[in-house]
UniProtKB/Swiss-Prot annotation:
One of its GO terms (cellular component) is extracellular region. This is Chymotrypsinogen B. The active site is at 75 (charge relay system), 120 (charge relay system), 213 (charge relay system). Its EC number is 3.4.21.1.
Amino acid sequence: MAFLWLVSCFALVGATFGCGVPTIQPVLTGLSRIVNGEDAIPGSWPWQVSLQDKTGFHFCGGSLISEDWVVTAAHCGVKTSDVVVAGEFDQGSDEENIQVLKIAQVFKNPKFNMFTVRNDITLLKLATPAQFSETVSAVCLPNVDDDFPPGTVCATTGWGKTKYNALKTPEKLQQAALPIVSEADCKKSWGSKITDVMTCAGASGVSSCMGDSGGPLVCQKDGVWTLAGIVSWGSGVCSTSTPAVYSRVTALMPWVQQILEAN
């Protein structure tokens, strides 16, 4: 059953740079590794980070939720020997003003299950805080009772594959606009695998794909971009007619708040 590929993302409030309000405005065509996505405007998704191993290999995405914290997917298997790269757009360029941040602690949700991919969320505490700027800032976290109804057009970003059988991932950050899909419609594709800690989006001609995992699904709420989902899993061939599955951040907020308050 080729149903497992995985993705994830998060971010909190900055001092001078408020959460969820990019200094450089994103421009989405709405048509838009993301399969059938498009290049993002550099710096327009300032919470997007790249998780890289010590060789510099990008293996997952993530989201800044504050200067000190990143949210990603548990299935990414992040270790403290990995690094968080913030402020990046073109992974093939060495001209960018990126921040390479060490990870002090990895908090994987203890209820995460690799077989059901439930509770697919990990928080990373940074060893040194990110320096917020016009290209590095946080996404807003939702309230537990926030609702992102079916049909809401949201955005996902990442450096994941643009075709499931592509030999390599794109160098430039990709973006796509995609609608939230109802639980009932999502279950038509995925059945009982879908639970209350998941949300679905896509089936609209675009899809997240391998390498996007851990990155953000963001929706505009009261004028700010809010983290609704973390790229988790989906079609093994990144089908653009099947919804992709994201960790439902509202359902996981009690655990997030518990970790942030205790650390």
